[in-house]
């Protein structure tokens, strides 16, 4: 009975703490990586992910012949291109000492474990989202920025300068101001604030090893070694609002006794599913097909840049129209049904994608 009560208390605590922390993180990080349930994300993504469609209005030739194809524009279809992943918490053995504590104060133990589980789950969400974002953006050469070589008195130091942020964001042209969230590891952040003068830096969110810092220009710096593991050493991500969506699908947790061995064992564990989508990108069919329906996607699958491509949209079948094929010649050739030229696949402008990938360059000694 005690384990049943503990399980109920644990589930209640975790399911309350995760949404609360996700909502605060979403606001603190300028909505670059949006974490939440499907209903929450649906509204957020519809508001943020479409953004400005590049070159929406263009010249038109009023004298163009029938059948002249037009270049289509593409709206972001993030959630339809999402990838489903599964993960687990534990299993963790419940020691006799912990069991005694559970029997004494079940609320305290449930709250303590829930806090640890919440932190671990959030970091896993972030690791998957940032890893997928980095891999997707890396597949697009137009979205990659390499820091220029620099010389200093020591050499071998890797950190961004204040100039690198606007220079990297300039990949987005007149939409550069959209990139206000920068993801990096703890060492990169430490070197950055040590060697650069960051105006009015202050902490706006923290849970465990994850920190979100803000500056006087409205930028957010998300520092996490867990997420940086997915990005790789010496990389930073600059993301727009709604760049990455992580849709949470609930959490199941179980605490129970197990017999049949030398001693009675007690365990607790949890499992959850979630979806990851990156604005302007999709997982290639060649990467999806061998996995879907066979096994669950793993982090390695979505953090490999070769598995991603720009979401170029789709085209309809070329329509058939009735028109006068020729002004001269046999009457039988007139009024025939003619198929128009095949439509061009819509191309996605970089401004309609998730952001930019920054590769930092180590300094050389003078």
Task: State what each model feature region is.
Residues 1-82, 218, 248-251, 292, ...:
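N-terminal "assembly arms/tails" that initiate or stabilize quaternary assembly
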Residues 215-312:
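Internal mixed-charge
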Residues 135-215:
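Extended, solvent-exposed, turn-rich assembly/linker loops in the middle of proteins
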């Amino acid at each position: 009975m005690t384990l049943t009560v503990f399980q109920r208390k644990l589930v209640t605590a975790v399911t309350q703490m995760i949404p609360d922390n996700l909502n605060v993180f979403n606001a603190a990080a300028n909505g670059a990586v949006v974490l939440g349930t499907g209903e929450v994300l649906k509204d957020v993504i519809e508001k943020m992910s479409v953004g400005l469609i590049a070159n929406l209005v263009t010249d038109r030739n009023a004298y163009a012949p029938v059948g002249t194809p037009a270049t289509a524009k593409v709206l972001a279809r993030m959630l339809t291109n999402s990838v489903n992943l599964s993960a687990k918490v534990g299993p963790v053995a419940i020691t006799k000492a912990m069991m005694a504590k559970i029997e004494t104060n079940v609320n305290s133990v449930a709250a303590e474990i829930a806090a640890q589980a919440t932190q671990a789950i959030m970091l896993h969400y972030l690791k998957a989202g940032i890893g997928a974002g980095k891999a997707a953006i890396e597949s697009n050469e137009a979205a990659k920025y390499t820091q220029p070589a620099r010389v200093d008195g020591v050499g071998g130091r890797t950190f961004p300068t204040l100039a690198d942020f606007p220079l990297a964001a300039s990949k987005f042209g007149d939409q550069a101001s959209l990139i206000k969230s920068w993801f990096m590891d703890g060492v990169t952040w430490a070197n950055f604030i040590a060697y650069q003068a960051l105006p009015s830096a202050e902490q706006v969110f923290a849970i465990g090893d994850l920190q979100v810092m803000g500056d006087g220009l409205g930028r957010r710096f998300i520092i996490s070694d867990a997420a940086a593991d997915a990005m790789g050493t010496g990389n930073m991500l600059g993301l727009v609002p709604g760049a990455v969506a992580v849709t949470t699908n609930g959490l199941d947790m179980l605490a129970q006794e197990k017999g049949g061995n030398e001693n009675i064992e007690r365990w607790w564990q949890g499992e959850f599913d979630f979806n990851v989508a990156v604005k302007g990108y999709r997982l290639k069919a060649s990467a999806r097909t061998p996995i879907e329906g066979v096994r669950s996607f793993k982090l390695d699958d979505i953090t490999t840049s070769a598995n991603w491509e720009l979401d170029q949209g789709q085209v309809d079948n070329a329509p058939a129209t009735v028109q006068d094929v020729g002004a001269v010649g046999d009457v039988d050739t007139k009024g025939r049904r003619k198929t128009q030229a095949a439509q061009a696949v819509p191309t996605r402008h970089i401004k309609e994608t998730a952001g930019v990938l920054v590769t930092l360059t180590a300094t050389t000694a003078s």
